[in-house]
Amino acid sequence: MNIQNDKERLLNGSIDEIEIITTDNNENDTIRNDDILKNSQLREQQQHQQIQQQIQQQKKESSLSTIASVIAFYFFISISLVFLNKILLSDFKFEYPLFITWYQQIISFVSIYIMTSISKSVPALSFLPEFEFKSATASKVLPVTAVLTGMVIFNNLCLEYVEVSFYQVARSLTICFSLILTYIVLKSKTSYRATMACLVVFLGFVLGSAGEVNFSWLGIIFGLLSSFFVALYSIAVKRVLPAVDGNEWRLSIYNTAISIGLIFPLILVSGEANTILDEPLLYSGTFWFYMTVAGLMGYLISISVFMQIKHTSPLTNTISGTVKACVQTILAVVFWGNPISTQNAVGILLVIGGSFWYSMQRFFEMKK
């Protein structure tokens, strides 16, 4: 019996030891499995983070590429438009600025119609509204279109009589007129710093004009009128936007269509229609190519500004405009050989610097 009991105790002890060993092994296996799982999860997290970092880097590179592209597009369109119009008016010696403006408005109108027609099928143009033209809306928009028409006409007239290097100075008093009209029409006062910036621009205008080698009173007068209409348009457009549901692109449809009708009678009254048919350039394919491209540029400038603000910011748009003015002046000196006196150069720098200061000041005031 004792021997039998001893055997049973030994057997039970062995079983217990086996169970303990098995339990320990199971626990060790569980720990190892947990470690393997944790390491696997850690590797997955690291891989996920690496993938996310790569995606962010690609987005950043893509974003920088997009920003650089839209700014370059704005520079190209804006400077090309000025140069093309100068070529038409001076190099071709086509002395019919009203006809040039009228034809370019027609090209812009055709461009608008095409772009709005395909906007639904082209995601990049989804911001454009459907084409429409209602007489009731047109009558409300008419006063603003008249201002815009004056602005475009005097722009081209100014460019006909001044050098491209002086063009920025001749039209520089826009912010000064804006300050005056804002006070008279909107009863709104401008801050001290913004006013000082306007004075810097005015001083630059005076110095630049006095130092201009190829000075033209007509160019100065047309530049002043252009500046006045630009300032007036920026105020008047705010009052008419409700008529087009606050959509500036819809307003551009009406502006372009109505301006075509407004400019045509001016061509007749000015006398351009009496002699234009005798102009040999009307039978030149090169001339019409330049005219058409300039018309396309006139519409694309609005698109380029919109894209620049969309992908950057209003502040970047302001800085870009200032740099563009510098580049435009330099290119005018290089390609056209426009002579610049020291006084004229100081005036140009004051105008560009003052305009930049004013824009920056207004931007930060609006953010408050």
Curated annotation (Swiss-Prot):
<protein>
    <recommendedName>
        <fullName>GDP-fucose transporter 1</fullName>
    </recommendedName>
</protein>
<feature type="transmembrane region" description="Helical">
    <location>
        <begin position="217"/>
        <end position="237"/>
    </location>
</feature>
<keyword id="KW-0813">Transport</keyword>
<comment type="similarity">
    <text>Belongs to the TPT transporter family. SLC35C subfamily.</text>
</comment>
<comment type="function">
    <text>Antiporter specific for GDP-l-fucose and depending on the concomitant reverse transport of GMP. Involved in GDP-fucose import from the cytoplasm into the Golgi lumen.</text>
</comment>
<feature type="transmembrane region" description="Helical">
    <location>
        <begin position="98"/>
        <end position="118"/>
    </location>
</feature>
<feature type="transmembrane region" description="Helical">
    <location>
        <begin position="195"/>
        <end position="215"/>
    </location>
</feature>
<keyword id="KW-0472">Membrane</keyword>
<dbReference type="GO" id="GO:0036085">
    <property type="term" value="P:GDP-fucose import into Golgi lumen"/>
</dbReference>
<keyword id="KW-0812">Transmembrane</keyword>
<dbReference type="InterPro" id="IPR004853">
    <property type="entry name" value="Sugar_P_trans_dom"/>
</dbReference>
<dbReference type="GO" id="GO:0005794">
    <property type="term" value="C:Golgi apparatus"/>
</dbReference>
<feature type="transmembrane region" description="Helical">
    <location>
        <begin position="251"/>
        <end position="271"/>
    </location>
</feature>
<keyword id="KW-0333">Golgi apparatus</keyword>
<feature type="transmembrane region" description="Helical">
    <location>
        <begin position="141"/>
        <end position="161"/>
    </location>
</feature>
<dbReference type="GO" id="GO:0000139">
    <property type="term" value="C:Golgi membrane"/>
</dbReference>
<feature type="transmembrane region" description="Helical">
    <location>
        <begin position="332"/>
        <end position="352"/>
    </location>
</feature>
<keyword id="KW-1133">Transmembrane helix</keyword>
<feature type="transmembrane region" description="Helical">
    <location>
        <begin position="64"/>
        <end position="84"/>
    </location>
</feature>
<feature type="transmembrane region" description="Helical">
    <location>
        <begin position="166"/>
        <end position="186"/>
    </location>
</feature>
<dbReference type="GO" id="GO:0015297">
    <property type="term" value="F:antiporter activity"/>
</dbReference>
<keyword id="KW-0762">Sugar transport</keyword>
<dbReference type="GO" id="GO:0005457">
    <property type="term" value="F:GDP-fucose transmembrane transporter activity"/>
</dbReference>
<dbReference type="InterPro" id="IPR050186">
    <property type="entry name" value="TPT_transporter"/>
</dbReference>
<dbReference type="Pfam" id="PF03151">
    <property type="entry name" value="TPT"/>
</dbReference>
<feature type="transmembrane region" description="Helical">
    <location>
        <begin position="287"/>
        <end position="307"/>
    </location>
</feature>
